[in-house]
């Protein structure tokens, strides 16, 4: 069992029951999945970009991402339907908890001028989104082997009904909120 998964069962659940007064353990919000998405609009010019991004995401997530394709043609962006324009990977279960552990304890402190993550990036339904500007904050990425700095979106989907519950859940996982 992953360290954060054990921590959730032993410390987070009792703390949230006490704070919000849940009657059942099943009412306590939990993280269902973490989705990592890399949009690669510049990949229309060079197919190697997709391969490099897939390699980076594989190292970061620990599992192979799926290449996302354009749903429809957009002449302004010079893309046709079916063109590969991104890569995404969905983490659940033990892999999700291990990624969350590495993200909070190792990757976030490596961000330059880091003052905490925004407490306002919740979507109103208890899900949290965070953007990472460069993939080199993850220790799995070798700085000398990357071809370009690429950002990625990280979506944390929870069973929380409100943003306050989701924020309390993530804060109990030692998420460094600045406000």
From Swiss-Prot:
It holds the Pfam family Ribosomal_L5_C. It comes from Burkholderia cenocepacia (strain HI2424). GO terms for biological process: translation. HAMAP family: Ribosomal_uL5_B. Keywords: Ribonucleoprotein, Ribosomal protein, RNA-binding, rRNA-binding, tRNA-binding. This is Large ribosomal subunit protein uL5. SUPFAM superfamilies: RL5-like. Part of the 50S ribosomal subunit; part of the 5S rRNA/L5/L18/L25 subcomplex. Contacts the 5S rRNA and the P site tRNA. Forms a bridge to the 30S subunit in the 70S ribosome. InterPro entries: Ribosomal_uL5 (IPR002132), Ribosomal_uL5_bac-type (IPR020930), Ribosomal_uL5_C (IPR031309), Ribosomal_uL5_CS (IPR020929), Ribosomal_uL5_dom_sf (IPR022803), Ribosomal_uL5_N (IPR031310). Belongs to the universal ribosomal protein uL5 family. This is one of the proteins that bind and probably mediate the attachment of the 5S RNA into the large ribosomal subunit, where it forms part of the central protuberance. In the 70S ribosome it contacts protein S13 of the 30S subunit (bridge B1b), connecting the 2 subunits; this bridge is implicated in subunit movement. Contacts the P site tRNA; the 5S rRNA and some of its associated proteins might help stabilize positioning of ribosome-bound tRNAs. The gene is rplE.
């Amino acid at each position: 069992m992953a360290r954060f998964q054990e921590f959730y069962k032993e410390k987070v659940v009792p703390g949230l029951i006490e704070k919000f007064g849940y009657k059942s353990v099943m009412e306590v919000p939990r993280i269902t999945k973490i989705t990592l998405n890399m949009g690669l609009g510049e990949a229309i010019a060079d197919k190697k970009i997709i391969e490099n991004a897939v390699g980076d995401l594989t190292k970061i997530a620990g599992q192979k991402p799926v290449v996302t394709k354009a749903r429809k043609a957009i002449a302004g962006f010079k893309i046709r339907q079916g063109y590969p324009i991104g890569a995404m990977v969905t983490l659940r279960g033990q892999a999700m908890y291990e990624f969350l552990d590495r993200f909070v304890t190792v990757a976030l402190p490596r961000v330059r001028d880091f003052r905490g993550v925004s407490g306002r990036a919740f979507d109103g339904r208890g899900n949290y989104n965070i953007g990472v500007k460069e993939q080199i904050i993850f220790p799995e990425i070798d700085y000398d082997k990357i071809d370009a700095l690429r950002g990625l979106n990280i979506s944390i989907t929870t069973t929380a009904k409100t943003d306050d519950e989701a924020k309390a859940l993530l804060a109990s996982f030692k998420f460094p909120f600045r406000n």
